[in-house]
Every structure is written in C-alpha cells, then in structure tokens.
C-alpha cells in the first residue's frame, strides 16, 4: 500500500498544504522546527488517529484555530481509498470514502504504518510505558478488536482508580462497586493479555532471524513478556481470568491503601534477551539499537503476513542515529517494496541507492518551497 497524496488544514504549523508522493521513497528535508516532523506525524495520525508525540489532540491544531484536518488518498492492491480525520476540541471524527465511521476502531488498520524515530531507540532501555505503547499501537493495526478491548479496559481502570482513591477514607460502603469494576477489568484484561501473547509469539518469529542477520549470526534475540500476575502463554482465557481474580483478591487491601490498581496489563512489561543476557541491563548501546531495529523490521514483515500488503514506513530523523552498517541494512531491507518517508536536515553523508531514486521535498516554516526528483 502507499499514500499518493495528503492535504492538511490548520495542522500544527501548516495552515494549508496539498502534496503528492512517490510510491517508493520520499525524502523530506528541512532545518529543525520547520515542519518536516509535523508532516511525518500527520501521515501517522491519518493512519492511527492519534499522535506518537503527544496524547493531547489540541496540540495538533494550529494555534488560534478551532479545528485541524488531514485528508489522504491511499492506494491498496485492489482498491483506492480516501481517508479523512477531523480534529476539534470535542474530539476526532474519521471518514472512509466520505462515510463517517462510528468508532475509530473501525477506521484504524485500514492504512498501516510503522514509525521509526529517535525515541524508538529507547524502546529497549526506556520505561515500561514505552514498550506497552509499542505493543498497543502495533497490535491495534492488525487486530481492531484489541483496540476495543483496550479502550474498554482503560475506561474501567479510570473508574476503578477513582473509586479506590475514594475508598482510602472509608472502604466499607463501596466494596460491592469495587467488585463490579474488578470483574469488568478482568474480562477485558484477560483478552488483552491473550492478544499480546499471540502477537509477541509472531513478532519473535520475525525478529529473531532479522536480529541474527544484522549481527552476522553472532546474536540470538528473545522477547519475553513480563505480566504483573502469574500467567503464561499456554493458559486459556478462562484460566487467565481465574488467575486474575485470585490475584485481585490478594492485593485488594493494598490497592485500597494505595488508592490505585496494582495489577493488570497496564502494569506489564517486555524484556529483551540477547544470547540469554538481558539487553536492557547488560547490553551495549549497539546491541540495544540492533534490537530496536530488529523489532521495527519485524513489524513490517508481521504486518505484511497479516494483511498481505506492506505498511508505509516513516523514518523520522532516525538514519543519522544509526551507524553506516545498520543504516545500510535498514535501507537494503526496505528497498523497492515499502513506501518510505525519510526526514533529515541533509542527505549529505547518506549514500544509498534507495535515496538516489527518491522524491525530495524541501520544507521551510510550514511551507513546501520546492519538490524535485533526485537524479
């Protein structure tokens, strides 16, 4: 699949923009704070209906405006689709072929993207929240039902945490309501956990050989899911629910004392092992970056295996963060088969056949000054 054009209105520092793209490689060049990352973000938001940079949708709307809009044309193997996302203070509305979607979960997954930005290099050594977000965003693209379960879980979690804070003063009168929220949380949480296990099993199958290739056969990568309760991938849904129920009973008084939910998918984490050593703790910076790159390349292949089309790859100022070897491995892997967007302050020092065939877009202060095809 590839995006052939995009239109922005009141998005970040763009008042109005219409731009067409090549189906292979597009290089967006500009100095810092000119709008190249905003353009890249707009493509991501068009696909995912949320930003990878902020959870506050208001930040996506141009200063002093009431709404922002992103439109795009997506070319898939057997169809052409128009996508539209309208952002206002009241929320977001999405359209497919001019038809408004009742739920964003019906919209997300139509256009698949993989974002690789400098912050993704922190996927390995960053906080558990970064790794959970990675899971949620990638799983949501190939399993819309996961997004539904996740949104329901988060709603119940918010209500339950509010009740737990209230119960810190007097818990006697609210225990029945707490039990109701607990059962709802278990129902959605168990399904989320099961989907995560399935996804990571597939991701492992792709990431391990990719990592082996990048490391020239010297390293073996293993991805391990670390749940907050004693469950395993081999358990069925009913057994997972049973373990959750028992675990919630055992931490009930602690949760009331702390005023927050102490177990569940929102507390889980991932660990990465290279040659049986925890790369988060003992890995070199090179091993951590190879692991992050392996995960991103595995995402591309996993999405292809599920939807039978390659996703759109967004490389936001990340090439300069990779050494020549990893840079070349990345570009060699995607060459000719994945529509790719690259942002950079300059193409100097990046010598690769892929970029020589690219369409180049120069961005200055929220406007596209010129577009040329590199010779």
From Swiss-Prot:
Primary location recorded for the protein, binned into one broad class: cytoplasm
SUPFAM superfamilies, sorted: P-loop containing nucleoside triphosphate hydrolases
GO cellular component: cytoplasm
Single GO BP term: DNA synthesis involved in DNA repair
Record has Cell division as a keyword: no
GO molecular function list: ATP binding; single-stranded DNA binding
InterPro entries: DNA-binding_RecF, DNA-binding_RecF_CS, P-loop_NTPase, RecF/RecN/SMC_N, RecF_2
Phylogenetic lineage: Bacteria, Bacillati, Bacillota, Bacilli, Bacillales
Annotated PANTHER family: DNA REPLICATION AND REPAIR PROTEIN RECF
Binding site for ATP: 30-37
Gene: recF
Function: The RecF protein is involved in DNA metabolism; it is required for DNA replication and normal SOS inducibility. RecF binds preferentially to single-stranded, linear DNA. It also seems to bind ATP.
A Pfam family annotated for this UniProt entry: SMC_N
PROSITE patterns the UniProt entry points to: RECF_1, RECF_2
Protein name, UniProt field: DNA replication and repair protein RecF
Signal peptide bounds: none
Family note: Belongs to the RecF family.
Protein location: Cytoplasm
UniProt keyword Nucleotide-binding present: yes
Keywords per UniProt: ATP-binding, Cytoplasm, DNA damage, DNA repair, DNA replication, DNA-binding, Nucleotide-binding, SOS response
């Amino acid at each position: 699949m590839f995006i052939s054009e995009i239109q922005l209105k009141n998005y970040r520092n763009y008042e109005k923009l219409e731009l067409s793209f090549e189906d292979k490689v597009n290089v967006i060049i500009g100095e810092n704070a000119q709008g190249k990352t905003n353009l890249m973000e707009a493509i991501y938001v068009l696909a995912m209906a949320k930003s990878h940079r902020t959870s506050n949708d208001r930040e996506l709307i141009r200063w002093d405006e009431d709404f922002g809009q992103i439109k795009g044309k997506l070319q898939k193997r057997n169809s052409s689709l128009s996508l539209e996302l309208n952002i206002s203070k009241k929320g977001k509305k999405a359209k497919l072929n001019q038809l408004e979607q009742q739920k964003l979960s019906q919209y997300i997954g139509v256009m698949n993207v993989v974002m690789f930005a400098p912050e993704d290099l922190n996927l390995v050594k960053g906080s558990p929240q970064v790794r959970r977000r990675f899971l949620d965003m990638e799983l949501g693209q190939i399993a819309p039902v996961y997004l539904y379960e996740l949104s329901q879980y988060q709603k119940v979690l918010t209500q339950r945490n509010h009740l737990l804070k209230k119960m810190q003063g007097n818990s006697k009168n609210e225990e029945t309501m707490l039990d109701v929220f607990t059962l709802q949380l278990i129902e959605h949480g168990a399904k989320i956990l099961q989907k995560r296990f399935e996804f990571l099993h597939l991701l492992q199958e792709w990431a391990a050989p990719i990592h082996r290739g990048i490391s020239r056969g010297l390293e073996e990568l293993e991805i391990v899911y670390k749940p907050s309760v004693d469950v395993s991938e081999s358990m069925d849904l009913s057994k997972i629910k049973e373990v959750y129920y028992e675990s919630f009973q055992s931490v009930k008084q602690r949760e009331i004392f702390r005023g927050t939910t102490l177990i569940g998918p929102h507390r889980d984490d991932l660990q990465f092992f290279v040659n049986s050593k925890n790369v988060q703790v003992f890995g070199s910076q090179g091993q951590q970056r190879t692991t992050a790159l392996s995960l991103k390349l595995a995402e591309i292949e996993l999405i292809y295996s599920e939807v039978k089309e390659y996703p759109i790859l967004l490389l936001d100022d990340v090439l300069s963060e990779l050494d020549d070897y990893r840079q070349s491995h990345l570009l060699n892997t995607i060459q000719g088969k994945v529509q790719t967007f690259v942002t950079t302050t300059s193409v100097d020092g990046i010598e690769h056949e892929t970029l020589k065939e690219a369409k180049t877009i120069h961005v200055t202060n929220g406007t596209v000054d010129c577009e040329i095809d590199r010779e």
